Amino acid sequence: MNKKVLSLIAMVLSLVLMLVGCGANSNSSSAQAPEVQETEKTETFRVGLECGYAPFNWTQLDDSNGAVPIDGSQEYAGGYDVEIAKRIAGGLGKKLVIVKTEWTGLLPALTSGKIDAIIAGMSPTAERKETIDFSDNYYKSDLVMVVKRGGKYDNATSIQDFKGAKLTAQLNTFHYTVIDQIEGVIKEPAMDDFPAMRVALESGMIDGYVTERPEAVSAESAN
């Protein structure tokens, strides 16, 4: 399926995405997951990633292009986030361990001590800052809409053109909340991950989804 990327021009100023690395807040629990031995904890830098958010992080079958083994798996993780994680681990003098984790499980994994950091497109909201600390952002991106090429909304040029469209975004992201700013649309339930949204777009279950530009370009290039 061909996909088309449409800029949400009217939202650019207020909806800039910040990608951050984050560590557990000093006020949060320091308890470690039982399976993580103390020796391993001190010698490794365990980073949580979805491994499904290209071009920032993805899953592949080999170690080409600098990919890193995924903990407990025969697969590997690659992407910009992985490269940043490698640099941080190197600076700490520790071995990098990538822990593949669903988006909704990243914060619990960090606060429980299962991982040492999250390196992902996670905005530093006030609620999140109550339990975890954020680094300075290392990337900013505009939000865009991904629609089906040749579909009903292929010629949309502004957010007003999406009246009646069935739209969604990823669960527990501010991408989903911005749909409320688009008048007259049908806000579908949020989805767990981007592969699911791409399939939903292919099948006609949705007319578009909100994402950041690099992910949208990746989706467009893959089809």
Which stretches of residues belong to each language-model region?
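Ligand-binding cleft/hinge of the Venus flytrap
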Residues: 60-72, 85-94, 172-192, 220-222
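Short loop->beta-strand "edge-of-pocket" segments that line small-molecule binding or catalytic clefts
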Residues: 46-49, 66-75, 158-173, 187
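Extracytoplasmic small-molecule ligand-binding "clamshell" domains
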Residues: 38-122
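Acidic, polar ligand-binding/catalytic clefts
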Residues: 90, 95-161
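Short helix-initiation/N-cap motifs at beta->coil->alpha
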Residues: 80-83, 97-108, 154, 188-199, ...
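Bacterial N-terminal signal peptides
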Residues: 10-20
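Bacterial lipoprotein signal-peptidase II cleavage site
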Residues: 19-32
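A ligand-binding cleft/hinge motif common to bilobed small-molecule-binding domains
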Residues: 104-105, 121-131, 178-181, 202-223
